[in-house]
Amino acid sequence: MVNAIEAFDAKHMKPAEEIPAFRPGDTVEVNVKIKEGNNSRIQAFTGVVIARQGGGVRETFVVRKISFGTGVERRFPLHSPAIDSIKVVRKGRVRRAKLYYLRNLRGKAARIVERRDNSEK
């Protein structure tokens, strides 16, 4: 039974090369495949990752952005076939794994300091 579950998970997981290394605080652009009737298109959703949960094929992440003054959050399954690509736009420096406190902050208070990597010399 356990082997069947592991085989199912391995079959449905995306290869590690397709998923960039990102963590909470990073700004990402998620390109999602949208199907409308008989045609499909790709829609970009750019925002700050405020949480990552789960593991394996069940792993999800939450992206938050401000759209026309209103906060919009969207939860994406990491290995979903509906996700075309994920691109890290900016790396952020935070000290928490879950950034739910950003929901209560407005304007400059909701900014996240950029993380500098010294390894890119």
Curated annotation (Swiss-Prot):
Listed SUPFAM superfamilies: Translation proteins SH3-like domain
Gene name of this polypeptide: rplS
Stated name of the protein: Large ribosomal subunit protein bL19
Keyword Ribosomal protein: yes
One annotated GO biological process: translation
Organism: Bifidobacterium adolescentis (strain ATCC 15703 / DSM 20083 / NCTC 11814 / E194a)
Source superkingdom: Bacteria
UniProt GO MF annotations: structural constituent of ribosome
Keywords: Ribonucleoprotein, Ribosomal protein
Taxonomic placement: Bacteria, Bacillati, Actinomycetota, Actinomycetes, Bifidobacteriales
Family membership: Belongs to the bacterial ribosomal protein bL19 family.
UniProt entry tagged with the keyword Ribonucleoprotein: yes
